[in-house]
Regions:
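Calmodulin-binding IQ motif alpha-helix
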Residues: 551-566, 608-714
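Core structural elements
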Residues: 123-127, 151-165, 191, 206-214, ...
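Alpha-helical coiled-coil scaffolding segments
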Residues: 195, 200-206, 334, 537-538, ...
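Helical/strand "switch-coupling" subdomains that flank nucleotide/phosphate-binding cores, especially
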Residues: 55-59, 74-207
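Long, non-coiled-coil amphipathic alpha-helical linker/lever segments
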Residues: 130-132, 189-235, 619
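Conserved helix-loop functional segments at active or binding sites
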Residues: 245-253, 651, 655
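Short amphipathic alpha-helical segments embedded in low-complexity Lys/Glu-rich regions
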Residues: 14-19, 102-105, 150-157, 168-177, ...
Length: 714
C-alpha cells in the first residue's frame, strides 16, 4: 500500500504517503498481540479497500474490522501478551504522562500478568520506542492531540480497572460486593467521568428484566469481578471500533471508481493453555469460509466457462480436499451448528450449554466432521469439529452467554445516560469522549415497555460499522440483519417453539451474516491469494521445521493448487481482441487475411506453439503468459524488427474492478513481470525486444484509461 501511495502524484498523494502507513500502525497497535507462534499476530479480521480514481490513482482507503478478540483484554492466554497498546503505554509514557495516568514503576497490572511492572529490558525498550511511533502515527492519521490524550487515558483506565478487588462488607446488611481498594476505584471513576459511588454500584449490582419486571441482582466478589472484566472488554472494543471509524472518516472516499480489497484473518485457532470457546469457533468458521472460497475459485469457478468454450479437455481434473461438508455442518440453514446455537441462545434461560450440545448431537452425530466428546473438568459437554486445518475440540462452557453477548444496561445508563430524561440525575459521563463511545450508533439498546427512560437490554453489534463496497457504483449496500434472514427461514427441526426474545441478534449468526456480505463482494472481483507458511513454531530466525511446514502445506492444499495452475489459462481474450492487440506484429508476419479465428491459428503456427500453449475456444483464445512472452520475443528477433533505444520495462497496470471482472490490468501486470523475468534469464544483453510488446500493452491501457499518468508505476 505504501508503494501505491508513494507513486501517487499531487497533494492528495503526498498525504496518503504518511496517512496509510500511520493508519495501519494504529490498527496494528490496538488489534495485534504477541502470541506463542507470532510476535505480531493480528487478533481481528481485517478487510481493507484501496480506492482508485478513473485514472488509476489511489485516492482513499477503507478498513472493516471483523471479530476483535475482546476476551484477550481481561484474560490473555498463558504465555501470550495482551494487545500491544497496553505495553506501549506502560513502557513509553513520558514522566508527565506517567504522573497523570498513575503509571508508576512499582505498579503492576493484572491484565498484563504478574510481572507487568518489571518486563524484560529489551522488550520494554522496544515497546517504549513503538509508543513514540504510535503517537506520530495517530497524528498523521488525523487524530488531534485531545483525541490522543483521551485514548491514552482510556487505555490507562482499563488497566487500573483490572486492578479493582472486591470483598464482602460484613458491617452492611446487603450481600453485594464492595470495592476493597477504593483509591483505585476513585481513579478509574475520574478517568471515566463518573462518581466512584455510581461506578461501584454498576459493578456490584446487575439489573435484569424478568417477566416485564426489573430486578436487581446482588453480585458476590466473583460476580463483581466478572462484571468488571465485562466493562473492561466493552470499553476496549468500543475504543477500537471508534479508532477504525475515525480513520475511515479521514481516509475513505465515496467518489472512487474501483478498488483493490485485501482480506486478512487470524489463522486457525486451537488453544492449548485453555479450552476452545465461541471466539475460537467463530475465527475457525471464518477460516473455513475463506478456504472454501479459495477452493471454489481455484478449482471450480472457471470450469463452466471452459466447458462452454469446448476446451475443458485441456484442464485435467485435480483431486483436492473439499471442505464443503464441514462448512455445511457449520452454517447450514436450518439446522447448522450456528443456527442451532443462535436458537438456543434466544430461548435462554430455558436452554443451556448442555441442551445446545444435545441438539448438536441429535442433528449431526453421524456427520464425518462432527464428534461428541466427553465432559470437561467443569462438567460441561464438549464437541469436536474436524476443520480443514485439523480437528478442534470446543468446550460448551459459556457458549450461550457469550453468543447472546448482552451488555449490562447499567454500564450504558452509567456512561451514556439518558439525554431525554426529565431529571438531570441520569446525565451519563461528564467526559464527552467516553460518552460518545456509547452512542446509539455503537450500542443498541432496548427500553422498558412501560418506561422509555429505563434501559433493560444493550448489545454491541459484532458487524463492522460500514459495509464492503459492492458492484453497484455510488451505492453502499447495508449488511442484512440476522432478523431479516431468519424471517425467511424455517425454524430448526429441534426448535419447535419460537424464540423467547423475539429474534435477538446473536454473535455467531451476526458474524455469519457479515461474512456473507463480505464474500458476496469478494465474489465480484478478480481474486489473488497469498498463502502464509510459518517456518517454525518457536519464532526463531533461520529455522525451518519440516513437520510443521509440511502440515501447513497439506492443510491449505498447496500441492493441489500447483497441479491445477500448471494447466490454467489466466490470460484470455476474444479472437478480435487478440488480433487488435497484436495487429502490428501480425502484419509484419504477413498475417492480414481471414477471419479473426483464422488469424489466431496462423499466428500460433508461425510462433511454433502447440494447441496446448495457445488454445482456441469458441469465443476466446487462451494464452499461457510464459509461452507468450518467450514466443513474441523470438518473433521479434527472427524477423529483425526495428529496434529503438530501450525505455525500460514499465509495469503500468490498472486494478481489477468489479465491473471488469476479468481483471485485464492484473493479467497484463503478470505478463509484464513474466516478460521481465524472461528477458533477464533467456535473452542475451544485445537483444531489446521487450519494448515492442510493452508498447502494444500500454496502448491497450491507454484506450481504456486515456488519462493514465505517466508515472503510475507498480
Amino acid at each position: 500500500m505504501l508503494e501505491l501511495s508513494v507513486s501517487n502524484p499531487g497533494k492528495k498523494g503526498s498525504k496518503l504517503v504518511t496517512q496509510i502507513p500511520a493508519a495501519e500502525f494504529v490498527l496494528e497497535s490496538f488489534g495485534n498481540a504477541r502470541t506463542l507462534f507470532n510476535s505480531n499476530a493480528s487478533r481481528f479480521g481485517k478487510y481493507t479497500e484501496l480506492q482508485f480514481t478513473e485514472r488509476g490513482r489511489l485516492c482513499g482507503v477503507k478498513t472493516l474490522d471483523y471479530y476483535l478478540e475482546r476476551n484477550r483484554v481481561s484474560a490473555p492466554p498463558s504465555g501470550e501478551r495482551n494487545f500491544h497498546i497496553f505495553y506501549y503505554l506502560v513502557a513509553g509514557a513520558s514522566v508527565e504522562e506517567r504522573q497523570h495516568l498513575h503509571l508508576t514503576e512499582k505498579t503492576s497490572f493484572r491484565y498484563l500478568g504478574q510481572r507487568s511492572g518489571n518486563p524484560r529490558q529489551n522488550g520494554r525498550d522496544d515497546d517504549g520506542l513503538r509508543f513514540e511511533h504510535l503517537k506520530h502515527a495517530l497524528k498523521n492519521a488525523g487524530f488531534s492531540k485531545r483525541h490522543v490524550a483521551q485514548t491514552c487515558q482510556l487505555v490507562a483506565a482499563i488497566l487500573h480497572l483490572g486492578n479493582l478487588e472486591f470483598t464482602i462488607d460484613r458491617h452492611r446488611n446487603e450481600d453485594a460486593a464492595v470495592v476493597r481498594n477504593t483509591e483505585v476505584l476513585t481513579l478509574v471513576a475520574e478517568f471515566l467521568g463518573v462518581t466512584s459511588s455510581a461506578l461501584e454500584i454498576a459493578l456490584s449490582y446487575k439489573t435484569k428484566l424478568l417477566k416485564k419486571e426489573l430486578c436487581t441482582v446482588f453480585l458476590d466478589p466473583d460476580g463483581a469481578t466478572d462484571n468488571r472484566d465485562d466493562l473492561a472488554k466493552t470499553l476496549y472494543s468500543l475504543l477500537f471500533a471508534w479508532l477504525n471509524e475515525h480513520i475511515n472518516q479521514r481516509l475513505c472516499r465515496d467518489d472512487f471508481v474501483t478498488f483493490i480489497g485485501l482480506f486478512d484473518l487470524p489463522g486457525p485457532q486451537n488453544m492449548t493453555s485453555r479450552a476452545n470457546s465461541l471466539d475460537q469457533f467463530c475465527i475457525n468458521f471464518a477460516n473455513e469460509r475463506l478456504q472454501n472460497f479459495i477452493q471454489k475459485s481455484l478449482f471450480e469457478n472457471q470450469l463452466p466457462e471452459y466447458t462452454a468454450e469446448g476446451i475443458a479437455y485441456h484442464i485435467p481434473r485435480v483431486q483436492y480436499f473439499d471442505n464443503s461438508e464441514c462448512l455445511r455442518l457449520l452454517q447450514h440453514r436450518p439446522g447448522g451448528l450456528i443456527h442451532i446455537m443462535d436458537d438456543q441462545a434466544r430461548r435462554s434461560p430455558k436452554k443451556t450449554d448442555h441442551t445446545m450440545v444435545e441438539a448438536f448431537a441429535k442433528r449431526w452425530n453421524s456427520h464425518s466432521s462432527f464428534k461428541l466428546g466427553n465432559p470437561d473438568r467443569s462438567g460441561f459437554p464438549t464437541f469436536t469439529v474436524n476443520h480443514y486445518s485439523g480437528p478442534v475440540t470446543y468446550s460448551s462452557e459459556g457458549f450461550i452467554e457469550r453468543n447472546i453477548d448482552a451488555l449490562s444496561p447499567d454500564f450504558v445508563s452509567l456512561l451514556r445516560g439518558n439525554p431525554d430524561s426529565s431529571s438531570g440525575e441520569n446525565s451519563g459521563s461528564i467526559n464527552p469522549f467516553i460518552k460518545g463511545l456509547f452512542s446509539a450508533k455503537a450500542i443498541a439498546v432496548q427500553a422498558h415497555p412501560r418506561d422509555e427512560d429505563t434501559i433493560v437490554a444493550a448489545q454491541q453489534p459484532v458487524k463492522p460499522m460500514r459495509a464492503p463496497s459492492t458492484r453497484r457504483k455510488n451505492t453502499i449496500k447495508r449488511i442484512p440483519t440476522l432478523g431479516d434472514i431468519d424471517e425467511k427461514e424455517r425454524e430448526d427441526e429441534d426448535a419447535n417453539a419460537p424464540p423467547s426474545t423475539g429474534g435477538t441478534p446473536c454473535i455467531a449468526g451476526e458474524f455469519r451474516s457479515a461474512l456473507d456480505t463480505l464474500f458476496e463482494t469478494l465474489g465480484e472481483t478478480q481474486p489473488w491469494y497469498v498463502f502464509c507458511i510459518n517456518p517454525n513454531d518457536s519464532q526463531l530466525p533461520n529455522q525451518l521445521e519440516g513437520r510443521s511446514v509440511k502440515g501447513q502445506v497439506r492443510s491449505v492444499g498447496l500441492a493441489e493448487v500447483t497441479k491445477r495452475y500448471v494447466h490454467t489459462f489466466p490470460v484470455g481474450m476474444t479472437h478480435r481482441e487478440f488480433v487488435d492487440r497484436y495487429r502490428e506484429p501480425l502484419a509484419d508476419l504477413g498475417i492480414s487475411e481471414g477471419s479473426n479465428q483464422e488469424r489466431v491459428e496462423q499466428t500460433r503456427a508461425a510462433m511454433g506453439l502447440s494447441d496446448h500453449d495457445v488454445v482456441l475456444g469458441q469465443y476466446k483464445v487462451r494464452l499461457r503468459p510464459l509461452y507468450t512472452a518467450v514466443a513474441v520475443s523470438d518473433i521479434f528477433d527472427r524477423h529483425s524488427f526495428r529496434t529503438r533505444p530501450s525505455r525500460g520495462l514499465r509495469t503500468s497496470s490498472v486494478p481489477a474492478t468489479p465491473r471488469n471482472k476479468s481483471g485485464t490490468g492484473c493479467e497484463m501486470l503478470r505478463q509484464r513481470l513474466v516478460s521481465r523475468h524472461v528477458a533477464q534469464t533467456h535473452t542475451p544483453p544485445t537483444r531489446r525486444p521487450a519494448w515492442r510488446l510493452n508498447q502494444v500493452q500500454r496502448t491497450h491501457i491507454d484506450r481504456t484509461f486515456p488519462s493514465r499518468p505517466s508515472n503510475f508505476l507498480w
